[in-house]
Amino acid sequence: GTYWQLLSNHKARLKALDQMGDKMIAMTRFSATDCLSQLVFEGVKTKSQVYNVQINDVQIRLRMLLNNEMDAVWLTEPLATAARLQGHRVMADSRDKKLSLGVVAFKKKAVADARRRKQLAAFTKAYNMACDSLNRNGLKHYSALLQKYYKIDKRTINALPKSKFQHVAKPQQENIDKAAAFAKTTIK
């Protein structure tokens, strides 16, 4: 499934989260990466403030890391692999927090409408079929699409870790609770 990694710039020579004081992290405010930043730095003592910089576009985040313009960035696959191949270090991984923040959300009004319910059922079926295809064939099978949309090379595609994509399912209560706690403390 989807996971996020906090990757530090190899030129910054950061080895531990407590060294991130006075450093900039590219992420998206009020999002999974913002929540993860809060969680990974809980209880971590840094000499000074860690600066969360809002860079919404993950392609731009990767380019900023590769161009030494950012100390650390939150990325998911396949861009995390591209960064690791360039020697950038994984400082944190959302899988370590046992947190899954990716959801497909629908408004109650949409679910109440019969025509919309039919569309949502078709969407869910197509999504689950895509997951099955990815799980059966692997990401490398879709290398042309990865190159086109993510602008990554064959080397990165060949280095991608094996991933398991999950069907649409109800979110786990633990994940809902963590997201709600984050929203309560962050969004005013």
Regions found by a protein language model. Give the residues of each.
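Short, solvent-exposed polar/charged micro-motifs at secondary-structure junctions
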Residues: 7, 61, 102-103, 167-170
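Secondary-structure end/capping motifs
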Residues: 112-187
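Short, glycine-/small- and polar/acidic-enriched structural segments
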Residues: 1-47, 52-55, 61-64, 71-77, ...
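Proline/Glycine/Serine-rich low-complexity intrinsically disordered segments
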Residues: 11-18, 41-42, 48-50, 62, ...
